[in-house]
Amino acid sequence: SYVITTPKMWVMPYGCGEQNMVNFAPNIFIME
């Protein structure tokens, strides 16, 4: 479940959630 909460943590402070999601998405899938 931490994979679902983690994106919110770095999406809010960075502000550019869309760009970060594209860069972090591959890493999130690897963590699974």
Swiss-Prot record:
Described purpose of this protein according to its UniProt entry: Is able to inhibit all four classes of proteinases by a unique 'trapping' mechanism. This protein has a peptide stretch, called the 'bait region' which contains specific cleavage sites for different proteinases. When a proteinase cleaves the bait region, a conformational change is induced in the protein which traps the proteinase. The entrapped enzyme remains active against low molecular weight substrates (activity against high molecular weight substrates is greatly reduced).
Keyword list, A-Z: Bait region, Disulfide bond, Protease inhibitor, Secreted, Serine protease inhibitor, Thioester bond
Name listed for the protein in its UniProt record: Alpha-2-macroglobulin homolog
Any coiled-coil regions, as ranges: none
InterPro entries: Alpha-macroglob_thiol-ester_cl, Alpha-macroglobulin_TED, MacrogloblnA2_CS, Terpenoid_cyclase/PrenylTrfase
Main localization category: secreted
Taxon lineage: Eukaryota, Metazoa, Ecdysozoa, Arthropoda, Crustacea
SUPFAM superfamilies: Terpenoid cyclases/Protein prenyltransferases
Cross-link Isoglutamyl cysteine thioester (Cys-Gln) mapped to chain: 16-19
Family: Belongs to the protease inhibitor I39 (alpha-2-macroglobulin) family.
Quaternary structure and interacting proteins, as annotated: Homodimer; disulfide-linked.
One example GO MF annotation: serine-type endopeptidase inhibitor activity
Compartments it resides in: Secreted
GO cellular component, one term: extracellular space
Pfam families noted in UniProt: TED_complement (PF07678)
Gene3D superfamilies per record: 1.50.10.20
